[in-house]
């Protein structure tokens, strides 16, 4: 009699994905973030579901309903802060996951990589709409500023913005539709994540050396299931420390003031995980140019497979490319810092230089360095 795990039509799929999956024997803790992202998504969907039971998407009561959740609902404060900080944890894992893909050359799996970039866009859209829902000052003005960027699109821009707003400004219609989209998008993300996994399991995982590992593979369970659980506990420790000790650390104090269309906050800025893109947007004085740079800063990830000029897949044995990669990481930290600063000297010029460096490293320096390394290795 065959094992149910291997013969049952439904359990068989789970078995091939998480139990008997042949996995390279040398993948490091950097390969943990895929499963952690899955857990983050589940946490966000569950906490979001319970928040949606008490939240009202009306401009007059949205802010009060969030206060009601925190004060009157059983453990409402915990659910709310887990959801808010869960987004931050989600993005930390996302950035590390993408960074690992860039470092170890995982982008050579075209379909997996491009669906990953699409997932990044979808998660960013979901997080942006979620930030609008508490209807605080930064929610309202963030929504106004970011949606207004679409007016830079020639000819159709103004009509498009008013269509998204559902009126002539960010108002009740905008909040209602943002809530609807914020509710549905995580399920679309879950579906995309399954497609992401489907394509990954067609080729098998990459590994730190970047070499083909078919001759040396081990089953995912128990080896990597245990390893992933360790990563999960470390993530939960950091996450719950943040939620229980300083839940407002990553938030904006302005969002504790109810939205007021007549009073503009001194510095309008998005959540920390968008600051790098926001800095790139602000570094260009022209509105349309800024919007194009903003979109390009993420879309440029789809260029990685095309720009790969090295004879080696991974950066593990390429010290010059490694140096450039870490300069790029430092540059992203700089952009994140600049995005949170006011638009004044010297922050403007630092932001412009950091933006130029970001695109130069990816489009020019990394491919040229890889070619030089090929020459140094006499390939």
From Swiss-Prot:
GO terms for molecular function: metal ion binding; ubiquinol-cytochrome-c reductase activity. Disulfide bonds: none annotated. Signal peptide: none annotated. One of its GO terms (cellular component) is mitochondrial inner membrane. It comes from the Eukaryota. It holds the Pfam family Cytochrome_B. Binds 2 heme b groups non-covalently. The keyword ATP-binding does not apply. Heme b b562 binds at residues 83, 182. A ubiquinone binds at residue 201. Belongs to the cytochrome b family. Component of the ubiquinol-cytochrome c reductase complex (complex III or cytochrome b-c1 complex) that is part of the mitochondrial respiratory chain. The b-c1 complex mediates electron transfer from ubiquinol to cytochrome c. Contributes to the generation of a proton gradient across the mitochondrial membrane that is then used for ATP synthesis. This is Cytochrome b. It comes from Xerus rutilus (Unstriped ground squirrel).
